[in-house]
């Protein structure tokens, strides 16, 4: 049996070793685990902070870091009575906007974590989408297809239009902040002029829900994800009908986030996050996945180093996308191959806790083949391959 003195010496040695232990630096921040499914996430525009809203109506603010053990919850809010559908930071990062199934709009002070403004019954039905246009103007869309555009200086909406027959899934606007676009569960793209405060047109009805919308290719193309796994492409000022479309070989394309002018990340109900090049249309590879869990939303951080994702596994995961802007896509369509595995675009593409090697190829292996499997087979349903 060791003497008391020996025990004390060992204890002091362990404390000393812990004090001088070098913190582990990770490629990406650790996963954040919540107690409910997270519907929505947003990165702070100036700091390493992430906001999240869950199906219970709770909103959380986290600081994140690549130093192991340094992710911290800064505050939480339970002001929403039902599921939180969307969170967004103001451009200066001082305010956090949120919308909910409870039909309310909340604006919170980010530093204090306090509710500053509440607009109850902002819509007659649950709110599903939101876009911040500038420091005073924002837009919201609801479950029945109504679009509202708000002026915070007056605290009221100055546009209240219903032209969609189903929920508004996403909203975006052009750089001039003149033409506002909506995607809808009725399968149409909506076009609105917020300068003249009027509705312009709806596109032709596509096959299945339009789940997301983004403007790409220096403002010349509008890209929509869809519930049946097809990406639809419209020409700017040619919103009536698609100019191109291609199947992504995914169950759905539920959320899209542009990374460059040509490359976007797309999340699906199959749990996989794909990098996709637009014109030429190619699935470049996989960023990562939530194994077997539907992804609700993805978001890009301010310096395009990380992508975050939230899914039905109640996890927020971070992915390294810093090399994605350097990906090159060949215009030339090679002969289709039977091997339809995705190229892994991050080290964590394999980090799933299960055997994901069966579905992915390592980047080093891929480079050794000189890009022979350039995902050319994934554009087999595309109507065109170049701009």
UniProtKB/Swiss-Prot annotation:
Ranges of Acidic residues composition bias in the record: 372-387
Keyword Translocase assigned: no
Pfam families xref list: WDR55 (PF24796)
Superkingdom of source: Eukaryota
InterPro entries tied to this protein: WD40/YVTN_repeat-like_dom_sf, WD40_repeat_dom_sf, WD40_rpt, WDR55, WDR55_POC1
Region (Disordered): 1-24, 356-387
SUPFAM superfamilies xref list: WD40 repeat-like
Knocked-out gene: effects: Death between 10 and 12 dpf. Thymus size is remarkably reduced and the pharyngeal arches are malformed. Eyes and swim bladder are also reduced.
WD repeats: 33-72, 79-118, 122-160, 163-202, 205-244, 247-286, 290-329
Broad class of where this protein is predominantly found: nucleus
GO biological process: chordate pharynx development; eye development; rRNA processing; swim bladder development; thymus development
Entry keyword set: Nucleus, Repeat, rRNA processing, WD repeat
Ranges annotated as biased composition (Basic and acidic residues): 1-10
One GO cellular component, as annotated: nucleolus
Subcellular location: Nucleus, Nucleolus
Similarity field: Belongs to the WD repeat WDR55 family.
Functional note: Nucleolar protein that acts as a modulator of rRNA synthesis. Plays a central role during organogenesis.
PANTHER family: WD REPEAT-CONTAINING PROTEIN 55
Protein name in UniProt: WD repeat-containing protein 55
